[in-house]
Amino acid sequence: MFRGAWMWPGKDAAALTICCCCCCWAPRQSDKPCADSERAQRWRLSLASLLFFTVLLADHLWLCAGARPRARELSSAMRPPWGAGRERQPVPPRAVLPPPPPSPGEPSASSGTCGPRYSNLTKAAPAAGSGPVCNGVPEPTGLDAACTKLESLQRLFEPTTPAPPLRPPDSPSRAPEFPSAKKNLLKGHFRNFTLSFCDTYTVWDLLLGMDRPDSLDCSLDTLLGDLLAVVASPGSGTWEACSNCIEAYQRLDRHAQEKYDEFDLVLHKYLQAEEYSIRSCTKGCKAVYKAWLCSEYFSVTQQECQNWVPCKQYCLEVQTRCPFILPDNEEMVYGGLPGFICTGLMDTSPKRPETKCCDVQWVSCESEKKKFKDSEPPKTHHQQFHHSYFHHYHHQYHHYHPRHEPPSRVSNKPSLLPVSGGSRLSPSRIRLCVLVLILLHTVVSFSSSQSGGGLGLETLPALEEGLTQEE
């Protein structure tokens, strides 16, 4: 009895110990599972944020380190110096009044001498000198010669004609009017000179439709009055009124060329540079943009045209032919807006009368491609079948394996890929994609492991409760 009485308390103590252990070690419903799930959720959010900011940082660093220095190199390489002239097609000679024969005591004017020359004199002078030397003084060339080559005009005017005053005393704000015959003499002279950049506009066009450049009086009557004063008194000086007007027109022409160079640089940066995947034919876009730009700077009607169209038509041509280039602004994000929008087309105010420009047949990339195909020799039946069967394969191969050809061959086969063409992955882009894939794999693996651990911890309270009930 004593032994049995002594053993039962030991069994009760053991049972109490087991119960206490079960009660102490059994996890509560709101313990580790909730904490682990919250910790896993925080890890997921942290890794997702890290992935997002890594992608943004890598893309921004790639743009800063690769695109902008390359664009500056292209800018310095593509922008020509202001002293160099552009190569232009020769302009057909216009019908002008032939110069009268020289006097017996005057030497005949030959090529390379100081005689009058009627041609397009707007090309840049050679680097060796400014022009032929006449009596020890370099003769001006280009558009500057329009006001200095006055030998023919001086012969056409009568020497005995008195020089009328520039401003009669009875009407100080109005120049004297001259007959149309003398104005036609100016027409025959100024129609031979065109601007350097906007070479489709003659000085005669500008004098007729834009006689107030920079608040100057460039009317025909003023120019004729000043010319007659110079002819009547040879020692009075140069044709000052003409020189001032020509300089004003040249300043506007240089401003137009600066704007065109900026547009050309943007097109080369986004459509022809190697850092960007877009390829497009921009020859027609540049030609239309130049015509529209000149029509905005010189709002005059072109006289030397066979057919005319409203100059506003040039703006619509630019809007349809040029690609959409969104502004490069880091502070704002543009979406769905074209890079060129025509405004003021419906403005018919009398302050700005409608001007007419030449109706030009623009050369497009499709027409050049058709012309190149027409010049190829005819293909046999086997060659046509081979071309049609393997066209898709070769197109894909050359798209993913571009070949750089010399400039002489590129001009014959222009790039005809659309603006929304497929992209080419550069090494930096490939490294960025690999980094993104690694981070995504890490997030998925960590989420899977946390989900598996969470399920194991959630089943732990149920097992402990079963053991407690059995005890």
Swiss-Prot record:
Residues 76-115, 158-178, 399-424 are annotated as: Disordered. It is a multi-pass membrane protein. Residues 90-105, 161-171 have a biased composition (Pro residues). Disulfide bonds: none annotated. The keyword DNA damage does not apply. The chain crosses the membrane at residues 47-67, 432-452. It is found in: Membrane. InterPro entries: NALCN_aux_factor_1/2. Keywords: Glycoprotein, Membrane, Transmembrane, Transmembrane helix. One of its GO terms (cellular component) is membrane. It comes from the Eukaryota. Glycans are attached at N120. Belongs to the NALF family. PANTHER family: NALCN CHANNEL AUXILIARY FACTOR 2, TRANSMEMBRANE PROTEIN FAM155. Probable component of the NALCN channel complex, a channel that regulates the resting membrane potential and controls neuronal excitability. This is NALCN channel auxiliary factor 2. The lineage of its organism: Eukaryota, Metazoa, Chordata, Craniata, Vertebrata.
